[in-house]
Amino acid sequence: MKKIYIILLILFVILISLIGASILLVMSLSGENVDLFGGEKIAKVYLCNEIYFDYNQGDGIFPQQKKDARYYINLLDDLEKDDSVKGVLLVVNSPGGEVIASEKLARKVEELAKKKPVVVYVEGLDASGAYMVSAPADYIVAEKHSIVGSIGVRMDLMHYYGLMKKLGINVTTIKAGKYKDIGSPFRPMTKEEKEYLQKMINETYMDFVKWVAEHRHLSINYTLKIADGKIYSGEDAKKVGLVDEVGTEEDALKKLEQLANVSNPEIVEYGLEENKGLFGLTYYLGYGIGKGIGEVLYGMEKINGRVELLS
């Protein structure tokens, strides 16, 4: 009987060890560093993709959680609550993304910055919605030849009624509600419809301008002058007040350690790997702000009728 108890105890220990190893393996495959001990830490978070909400997390044979805005919001929330994390270095290389996703992530950064220091390091591209996310940080460091700004709003609506006419294709739309088919690709847009959409774009743009002005301590009038959709090099962004310093990642880390009052902290990285599933191929539809240079730099294809916080 005693031998049976010993065998059961050994099996129990082996089972617990296997469960622990499995948890560590899953966390490792998800692209996160695993910290088993306490101590002062700096979290390095890589924001290196488009900012959007992905409601299809299961594509691919071995699906993993995608690095959408919800992932970053939840991650920053965890880092905010973790007392061992003394500051956050946000490494940005993003063209922006959807309006709501960018706004919610930006508000999360704003909330985090009230609790512990946040420094942004612009590695290559910090445009439009991504800059909205960066603005509430305590300090922004950009590489000299990085691209910053592209603060503006843009909506693209594709029309192919001309092609349909040539092909002899007709579409009959039955609707209830005057604006129900606004932006339809099957007919020309009316002047009234265009004015309506322009008003919506203008309102979104002013919200963006006010956000930048507030968090970069600039006047509204001045921000309007520099927020005309123009892109700036890191050096020029420093001159107009969109970043605080032209420098390297080491400079950004040094500044964060200074703000957090820590020395030689452990650096824990998050969000570095891109997880799109084995056969993931996603076109993102929705509501966002401005397109432009980010599409060229990122090689991203977009589809009709989306307003974006993209460069």
From Swiss-Prot:
Its EC number is 3.4.21.-. Keywords: Hydrolase, Protease, Serine protease. One of its GO terms (molecular function) is serine-type peptidase activity. Coiled coil: none annotated. One of its GO terms (biological process) is proteolysis. It comes from the Archaea. The active site is at S128 (nucleophile), K180 (proton donor/acceptor). Disulfide bonds: none annotated. The keyword Hydrolase applies. Pfam families: Peptidase_S49 (PF01343). The keyword Protease applies. InterPro entries: ClpP/crotonase-like_dom_sf (IPR029045), Pept_S49_SppA (IPR004635), Peptidase_S49 (IPR002142), S49_SppA_C (IPR047272). SUPFAM superfamilies: ClpP/crotonase (SSF52096). Belongs to the peptidase S49 family. This is Putative protease MJ0651.
